[in-house]
Amino acid sequence: MKGGLKGALKGGLKTALYILVAIPVTLTAQRTQAPRDITGYWVSVVSEDWHWRMVTPRKGDFTSLPLNDEGRRVANGWDPSKEKPADACKPFGAAAIMRVPGRVHITWADDATLRIDTDAGEQTRRLQFGKLATRGWRVNGRGEIEYFQQGTDAPPPSGPLTWQGYSAARWELAPDPKTVRNAVFFAGGLGTSPDGAGTIVPGTFGSLYVVTTQLRAGYLRANGIPYSEAARVTEDYDFWTDDVGAEWFTVSTTVEDPKYLSAPFVTSTDFRKEPDGSKWRPTTCAAY
């Protein structure tokens, strides 16, 4: 793609060129801006970390977790016999819920709010659009793709801390090679933009980016591995289709916690789309 852009520039563009992607920021545009329809039922496919995800690990097993001294102290002091009913959902908070085996149901609560329900723990996440800085891409004078950010993130609202916290989301729209090529021609006076009005439409390439804060303290794993109220969770959801036509998404999750972690804790989790909700089995935190 890079060479093709350079060729187009050499063919007729004499001056430095910057083409900005117009990413709609109005709340009503968020649903229609989705790179694809991501609604429906999805099941987690556990292909790694089976012995930490499918069963409760033994006390003191914090393999692969970057706990600091305080985190290890709390994890080693975990006593399940002292857990209260109010603690039952600690392993189902936003910092860990996508790693819990089960199904998720994705719907739009409204044009600016994506809703994710889980059958494991009966949790509901609400991803709010229009709260994060706008991110886009442009083609520079060397025919290279550059990413840029405009504006600032809105602060989270005040209120009680919850298991799922406050999640702000945006679409990370990447350039479609064909769209970029058309954009270069348009800027050089050699053609028209994809929509005929100067707006570069990013096509079907892209992912979902989510930042979650305002979390109630919980567990990264069911054996008492802690995360605190200061935890910050960032997620990248990539939606894709395999060679046999099955739809998938992969969520890369990063948990940062200055109280209990010495470094970010990063995981990658796969989900496959199901045809309907016939296998949906809601299970409370206590019964899981």
Map each language-model feature to its residues:
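Short intrinsically disordered, low-complexity coil segments enriched in acidic
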Residues: 1-3, 20, 148-150
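Short, low-complexity intrinsically disordered segments enriched in A/P/G/S/L with frequent Arg
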Residues: 3-16
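Residue-level recognition of conserved structural "scaffold" positions that shape functional pockets
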Residues: 10-11, 19, 47, 176
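Intrinsically disordered, low-complexity regions enriched for glutamine and histidine
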Residues: 11, 28-29
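Bacterial N-terminal signal peptides
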Residues: 14-26
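PEST-like low-complexity, intrinsically disordered acidic/proline/serine-rich tracts
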Residues: 29-288
